[in-house]
């Protein structure tokens, strides 16, 4: 079984030793929690899914403030906080068990640039409008829903970083109304593949104008009645 360090070296990813130590501890925590929090039962799978998949498409240094919506086990926000220490990261999740797990990991890894918050994305985005340089999410919802619940918290000129699978093309077509309503435009799609054979895409959307105050709609509505 490959080590975290060797797997990252295979992909040519750059890192410092303290970052590898933190990832090692994180993966240990991840594999030690009940499997309803994570589907990864071995190191190789966990590193590919939770570390390589997040870092591989990033070409630039991230700094400023970042919100991870529906953070779950901490991906992508926690990984980005480890490898981009100039980021100040908020991990947002509505489930108490996820937030408790995240707070435990933050303490064990001594991550001073990360906090975990228990709240619904619709409420948080409404309360913290125009606050973040980046908002990211993975495996939370379809793109049209993500655009509505994430964009209000993003600064004008800020970027949405959404990790998607091969179906992103269909989701992009479906999200045109939401993108227009929330005032974001597609800046770039970065397609990439893992050595496990999985195909992925990082969608980068830029907010060009403040989102209307009526968004996001109240809790649950963006999921039940998405903008189409």
From Swiss-Prot:
S-adenosyl-L-methionine binds at residues 70, 121-122, 138. One of its GO terms (molecular function) is rRNA (guanine-N7-)-methyltransferase activity. Coiled coil: none annotated. Its EC number is 2.1.1.-. Keywords: Cytoplasm, Methyltransferase, rRNA processing, S-adenosyl-L-methionine, Transferase. It is found in: Cytoplasm. GO terms for cellular component: cytosol. Its main location: cytoplasm. It is an enzyme of class 2 (transferase). Specifically methylates the N7 position of a guanine in 16S rRNA. Belongs to the methyltransferase superfamily. RNA methyltransferase RsmG family. This is Ribosomal RNA small subunit methyltransferase G. The gene is rsmG.
């Amino acid at each position: 079984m490959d080590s975290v360090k060797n797997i990252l070296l295979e992909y040519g990813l750059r890192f410092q030793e303290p970052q590898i130590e933190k990832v090692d501890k994180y993966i240990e925590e991840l594999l030690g929690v009940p499997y309803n929090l994570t589907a990864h039962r071995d190191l190789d799978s966990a590193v590919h899914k939770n570390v390589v998949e997040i870092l591989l498409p990033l070409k630039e240094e991230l700094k400023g403030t970042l919100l991870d919506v529906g953070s779950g086990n901490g991906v992508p926000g926690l990984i980005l906080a480890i490898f981009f220490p100039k980021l100040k990261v908020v991990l947002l999740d509505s489930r108490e068990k996820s937030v408790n797990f995240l707070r435990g990991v933050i303490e064990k890894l001594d991550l001073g640039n990360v906090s975990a918050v228990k709240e619904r994305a619709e409420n948080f985005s409404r309360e913290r409008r125009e606050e973040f340089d980046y908002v990211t999410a993975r495996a939370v919802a379809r793109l049209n829903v993500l655009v509505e619940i994430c964009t209000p918290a993003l600064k004008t000129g800020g970027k949405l970083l959404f990790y998607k699978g091969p179906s992103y093309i269909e989701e992009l077509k479906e999200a045109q109304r939401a993108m227009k309503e929330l005032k974001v435009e597609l800046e770039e799609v970065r397609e990439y593949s893992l050595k496990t054979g999985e195909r992925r895409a990082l969608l980068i959307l830029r907010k060009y104008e403040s989102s209307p105050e009526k968004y996001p709609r109240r809790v649950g509505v963006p999921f039940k009645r998405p903008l189409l």
